[in-house]
Amino acid sequence: MNNVPNVEKQIGIDLYTTKTPGIGGKLRQQTEDFGVIEITNREEGTEGKYLILELTKRNWETHHLIRDLTRILRISQKRVGFAGTKDKRAVTTQKISIYDMEEEALQNVHLKDTELKILGRSNKSLELGDLTGNEFIITVRDIDLDEKELESRLSQTTASIKEQGGVPNFFGIQRFGALRPITHVVGESIVRNDIEKAAMAYIAASYPDEPEDTQEVRNRVFETKDYIEGLKGYPLQLRYERAMMHHLVSKPEDYAGSFETLPANIRKMFVHAYQSYIYNTIICSRIKKGLPLNRAVVGDIVCFKNKAGLPDKSRNERVTEDNIDGMNNLVKRNRAFVTAPLVGYSSELASGVPGEIEREVIEELNVPIEGFKVPSMEELSSKGLRREILLSTDPKYFIEEDELNEGKYRVTLDFSLPKGSYATTILREYMKVEPLKMS
């Protein structure tokens, strides 16, 4: 029996779907151990007002690189398009577009740990919708098993994933915070309209994996609400907590206003994380009650494949006794996908046994459905939608001696996932370790 780490249980994940022992190991001992190659549905030509480039970067945050690139080219950042941001602590390859740019201008670009390759031209910029997925090439190091046992565990886990048709499409620990999984806790308080509790949780709730001095100053602020002391003691890298405390120094009761100091994408992350926690819990409950992920049952709601080959969450249909065979034929061919709810104030829930599971979880967690209309911060309101519950993937693995850790082995895993999915959902089934070792 493989014990799931407590931190994963806190985010709604309390099981593995593979029964094999984990291989252990560590990720990201060096930047090159984590590779991401963007998959798009674009084909570039030779004419057009946009220059299309392939950008390979090492240890760069995407927005920072675009900022530095546009400074060198002396152009506005608005002229650069890309389909998605990529991990910083990784070697990543993606397309970018630059409006009204000649190839010769790139001769002046010399940025550390980057490579730009001209692919062609287009009359269409790179946009978020162009991303269909990512290929991950990830090295797990410091594996303390003999080669025969390692091969056995890898082959059994891979066979199990193939037999299941993939792995659960969980929201990974990054959605919640690897060091401090707090975002869904904050989101729950927002949905319950306890904005003070939400603000204090984000600013001052401490977690055991944080540095001890950070835990201590958070605890003091939590007890005293002395934000001036907090600003003196909080490390500068905790810039979002510091921004909220700056606001509360001048307006001590304006907790909603303190959230307004955060970037819009960070504010939205809280309610999204709460929805993700409920969703993870529903998938685990479905598995424990013996319902499949790779096949629909009566009462399920499925969505259909769009032109890009991705789930179209706006096209849903309920599974009935009359259409179940046809639906499962589509599911088997990856043209339809079984879904679970990201709960909101206008959620469409399944019926039959899947619907019972969804309603049981919502009741057990005492989810206030109407609370997803957030009157104090309307932009955080969410109607809800449904998301596919299975990640179809076909991992490949390679075993080699680990040159960084004498007497140990390293395994390179190669797999592709659709956009919006988490590589850790695959890695956790192989490694079965604490999430911090995967971050």
From Swiss-Prot:
Q: Which UniProt keywords apply?
A: Isomerase, tRNA processing
The record's InterPro entries line, in alphabetical order, gives: PsdUridine_synth_cat_dom_sf (IPR020103), PsdUridine_synth_TruD (IPR001656), PsdUridine_synth_TruD_CS (IPR020119), PsdUridine_synth_TruD_insert (IPR011760), TruD_catalytic (IPR042214)
Asked whether the UniProt record includes RNA-binding among its keywords, one would answer no
Task: List each copy of the TRUD domain by range.
Answer: 166-391
| Catalytic machinery residues | 87 (nucleophile)
Q: Which parts pass through the membrane? A: none
Give the matching PROSITE patterns.
TRUD (PS50984), UPF0024 (PS01268)
Q: What class of enzyme is it?
A: isomerase
Per its UniProt entry, which superkingdom is the organism in? Archaea
Biological process (GO) annotations held by this record are: tRNA pseudouridine synthesis
Might you give the EC number(s) for this enzyme?
5.4.99.27
Which reactions appear under catalytic activity for this entry? Answer: uridine(13) in tRNA = pseudouridine(13) in tRNA
ATP-binding listed as a keyword: no
| Similarity remark | Belongs to the pseudouridine synthase TruD family.
Briefly state the protein's biological role.
Could be responsible for synthesis of pseudouridine from uracil-13 in transfer RNAs.
Q: Could you identify this protein by its name?
A: Probable tRNA pseudouridine synthase D
Question: What is the species listed in this Swiss-Prot or TrEMBL entry?
Answer: Methanococcoides burtonii (strain DSM 6242 / NBRC 107633 / OCM 468 / ACE-M)
